[in-house]
């Protein structure tokens, strides 16, 4: 496990700013009160607010054509979790992580769940991605996944989503987000109604697999 920021350091650095913070908070509270707004009620809601960190958010991302990794970028989901834990230490509002599959797939999800528990992190929505082909993929998503005219490609996309559901159950996630890259570029390339019907049929199979 990589070295995280010492929580004592965070506390010490925050303490240096506490006096100014309290002064600004009081001034803002007085201003809001003139408009019949209770700053304490807003603060209470803000303290309860939580944001899920997308696993890809800990990396440098990419361009339309390629990825250019930066120094210190996490190499796998375990390192992404470590970075996510640091974000939560600093913000105190990001206790959940939202993984993207197939990129975050692991061999042992029990191990991954234990790793996240040790970091005091839980899992938000599972993101299923079928908008690009993976190395060695038998059937292509070039012309769509869940709405592809090829039954074999549709079945492959459906199977991936069903796998995502099982992985989510193992991690304790309660939701599935399906990222669909299906579509066409020019008028006349695709029969919209037929494509939509194929998509709905695929989604019904996926929906039936939800717990």
Model-derived segments and their meaning:
Residues 1-149:
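Alpha/beta catalytic barrel-like cores
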Residues 3-4, 20, 30-45, 122, ...:
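Active-site acidic/histidine proton-transfer and metal-coordination neighborhood
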């Amino acid at each position: 496990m990589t070295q995280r920021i010492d929580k004592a350091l965070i506390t010490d650095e925050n303490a240096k700013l506490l006096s100014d913070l309290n002064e600004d908070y009081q001034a803002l509270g007085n201003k809001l009160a003139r408009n019949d707004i209770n700053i304490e009620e807003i603060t209470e809601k803000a303290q309860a607010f939580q944001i899920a960190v997308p696993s890809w958010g800990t990396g440098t991302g990419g361009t339309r054509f390629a990825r250019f990794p930066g120094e210190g970028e996490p190499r796998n989901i375990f390192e992404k979790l470590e970075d996510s834990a640091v974000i939560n230490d600093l913000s105190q509002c990001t206790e959940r992580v939202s993984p993207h599959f197939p990129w975050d797939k692991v061999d042992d999800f029990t191990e991954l769940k234990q790793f996240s528990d040790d970091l005091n992190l839980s899992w938000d929505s599972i993101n299923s991605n079928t908008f690009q082909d993976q190395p060695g993929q038998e059937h292509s998503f070039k012309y769509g996944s869940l709405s592809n005219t090829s039954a074999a490609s549709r079945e492959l996309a459906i199977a991936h989503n069903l796998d995502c559901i099982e992985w989510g159950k193992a991690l304790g996630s309660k939701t599935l987000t399906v990222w669909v890259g299906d579509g066409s570029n020019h008028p006349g390339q695709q029969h919209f109604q037929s494509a939509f019907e194929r998509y709905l049929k695929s989604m019904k199979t996926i929906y039936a697999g939800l717990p």
